[in-house]
């Protein structure tokens, strides 16, 4: 098995918690097709194992959870297939989108530790998990528009569920937001200092797991809500400007929106 995703199971009483750690620090844990396949395969396997009560997804290192798809690998594959079809890119996106759907529909508790850079495909993973931890250095964005792509990986679902016109604003400007903003617009559910990760994982392992999805989900929610963050939230960037954002993003005429921005 590839070491680009570290697969582990750690004890939680007489059960286990699965853990998937994106392990490509040099590329800020950017997703490759191989990584997507490992994540999907493990999630599907754990879904059918009663002893696995939850899954934690995090990233190696202190800089990033995941900077998105490995654009360099996608570019290289297209150069190698001038004029197309580009099998690598087609397979990558097809598999990535299936992985996103699997995350959104996963029955067991999914806890994502979204520290540092969380961009594009990384945000797709975070948004698909039920329990979405953000930290003091979380930096979230959907930068696809800057490379002539569109906000994918479930963006049409989670962007449209944000307050006001924030989803459209993030999609059209590729602006970055912090943990406070993530909590405000629903991309984050819990805030902790990054250095608390190990203690949070240990607390999860200490829960009285029942192998009952509904009961276990309630317990995870209660546990995470009961832990106090060791750092203060960063200053809000979205909420203070929601009226302006709504005004700029109003209507269906994109040219008019761009003129206002």
What positions do the PLM features span?
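Conserved CoA-thioester-binding segment of acyl-CoA-metabolizing enzymes
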Residues: 1-58, 101
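Catalytic-core regions built around general acid/base machinery
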Residues: 42, 95-106
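Hydrophobic/aromatic residues within transmembrane alpha-helices
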Residues: 57, 70, 125-126, 181-182
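Glycine- (often His-adjacent) and acidic-residue-rich active-site loop
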Residues: 59-98, 148
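Glycine-rich beta-to-alpha active-site loop
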Residues: 103-147, 169-170, 174-175, 179
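Gly/Pro- and small hydrophobic-enriched strand-loop and loop-to-helix capping segments
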Residues: 129-151, 186-201
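Contiguous mid-protein beta-loop-alpha structural module that forms a pocket-lining wall or clamp
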Residues: 154-214
């Amino acid at each position: 098995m590839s070491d680009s995703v570290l697969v582990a199971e750690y004890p939680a009483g007489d059960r286990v918690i699965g853990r998937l750690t994106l392990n490509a620090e040099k590329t800020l844990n950017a997703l490759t097709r191989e990584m997507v396949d490992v994540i999907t395969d493990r999630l599907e396997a754990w879904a059918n194992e009663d002893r696995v009560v939850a899954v934690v997804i995090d990233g190696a290192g202190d800089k990033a959870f995941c900077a998105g798809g490995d654009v360099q690998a996608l570019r290289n594959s297209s150069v190698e297939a001038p004029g197309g079809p580009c099998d690598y890119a087609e397979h990558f996106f097809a598999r990535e989108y299936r992985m996103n759907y699997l995350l959104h529909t996963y029955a067991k508790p999914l806890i994502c530790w979204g520290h540092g850079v969380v961009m594009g495909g990384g945000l797709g993973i975070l948004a698909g998990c039920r329990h979405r931890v953000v930290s003091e250095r979380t930096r979230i964005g959907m930068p696809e528009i800057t490379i002539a792509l569109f906000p994918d990986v479930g963006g049409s679902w989670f962007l449209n569920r944000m307050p006001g016109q924030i989803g459209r604003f993030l999609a059209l400007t590729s602006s970055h937001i912090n943990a406070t903003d993530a909590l405000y617009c629903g991309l984050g559910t819990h805030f902790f200092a990054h250095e608390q990760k190990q203690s949070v994982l240990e607390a999860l392992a200490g829960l009285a797991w029942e192998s009952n999805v509904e009961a276990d989900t309630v317990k995870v929610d209660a546990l995470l809500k009961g832990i106090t963050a060791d750092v203060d939230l960063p200053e809000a960037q979205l909420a203070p400007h929601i009226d302006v954002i709504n005004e700029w993003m109003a209507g269906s005429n994109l040219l008019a929106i761009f003129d206002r921005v």
